[in-house]
Regions:
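Short, small-residue-biased leader/transition segments that mark boundaries at the very start
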Residues: 2-6, 333-338
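Extracellular beta-strand ligand-recognition surfaces/modules
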Residues: 17-20, 35-50, 81-155
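Exposed, low-structure sequence patches enriched in small/polar residues
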Residues: 152-336
Length: 338
């Protein structure tokens, strides 16, 4: 038997560490089905849908005996809301289970696949069970389900209350940022300027919420130079050739694997078999953009004949420019389960 309630809401849970919820269960007043502790359980599902891609955590319910209880008494509160019924878990139990499932899936004799429910008991709370099916992600939780499951072989009737489902314990691993600039004037030959900017994962402004902090490392630097090529020729040539060149590079290295967004990229790299596979994932994960610009503006030779003519070199100018942009990174993902 199964009873449940649903909520649709897109949420990124990666910036939190724990998931909590109170649960209360009691037999109905007439108690005709005679339920006992552990015969029913409460569970919560988090995923992109309710059936094919979700994490699940299940807790066997301890029943509160019939009676009158004092809401101001801590001992009575623990009877009504038993610790055994409380959901208080690290969100990492889900991603740890995903790692184990994915490792088991690599063994063709295991029978494990994305399409089959994979379950283990919680090592810290051995009565509770953790499950996964498909490829859910805590980065994109679109559906939440809270349900009650009858684990006995007969009909059972109970009253269940759940309260204060919440995320807690922000990930307080902060980041840092820095930037620098340098300009050099080379007399009348030209100038050189350089700039750099770094922001690491976890960095955010004072006005930003936890969910708005960076989830990647960002590196950017730029080199720019302008100089007058004519200064390197004899004055008699009267050459004017202003040259401009710039080079910039931006690199974004995500904290999480872009192919599996609630798994740390470093863990995904460690799980790969060889350097070739690791380099391939890095090339996909890291987004790198480079710009190269070169221009020669209004180059002219200021030489004219004694009797000015239309075809004098000083009457002509030439300009040339070229811009090159190169992008590297993830552009398309398609994952299929055979």
């Amino acid at each position: 038997g199964l009873g449940d309630v649903y909520k649709r809401q897109t949420m990124d849970m990666r910036q939190y560490r724990r998931l909590k919820m109170f649960a209360h269960a009691a037999a109905l007043t007439d108690n005709v089905t005679d339920p006992e502790d552990g015969q029913l359980s409460v569970f919560i599902r988090l995923g992109s849908d309710y059936r094919s891609n979700f994490y699940e955590y299940e807790i066997p319910l301890k029943l509160t005996p019939a009676g009158h209880y004092n809401g101001d008494s801590e001992s009575d509160q623990l009877i009504v809301w038993p610790k055994d019924n409380m959901l208080d878990i690290a969100l990492s139990v889900f991603t740890d289970l995903k790692k184990k499932r994915n490792q088991a899936k690599n063994n063709p004799l295991s029978g494990v696949s994305y399409g089959k429910l994979y379950s283990e008991y919680d090592s810290e709370q051995p009565a509770n069970k953790i499950s996964i099916i498909g490829n859910p992600s805590l980065a994109e939780v679109k559906t939440m389900m809270i349900g009650v499951r009858n684990n006995s072989r007969s009909k059972k009737s109970i009253e269940v209350w759940v309260n204060e489902l919440r995320l807690s314990d922000f990930d307080e691993d902060g980041g840092w940022a820095a930037q620098g600039n340098m300009n050099v004037q080379l007399s009348d030959l030209g100038s050189v300027s350089m700039a750099g900017h770094v922001e690491t994962a976890g960095f955010g402004g004072l006005e930003q919420s936890v969910s708005e902090r960076r989830l990647d490392d960002y590196y950017q630097y730029q080199f720019t130079t302008t100089f007058e090529l004519g200064r390197f020729f004899p004055k008699a040539v009267k050459l004017s050739a202003p040259i401009y060149y710039s080079y910039s590079r931006e690199k974004t290295s995500p904290k999480y694997n872009p192919l599996d967004k609630d798994m740390l990229l470093k863990d995904a790299l460690d799980a790969l078999a060889n350097d070739r596979e690791r380099d391939s994932l890095r090339n996909i994960a890291n987004e790198i953009t480079t710009y190269k610009n070169f221009s020669l503006s209004n180059m002219r030779v200021g030489v004219t004949s004694k009797n000015p003519m239309p075809y004098d070199p000083g009457n002509f100018t030439m300009s040339y420019s070229r811009t090159k942009r190169h992008n590297q990174g993830l552009s398309l993902i398609h994952i299929s389960e055979p």
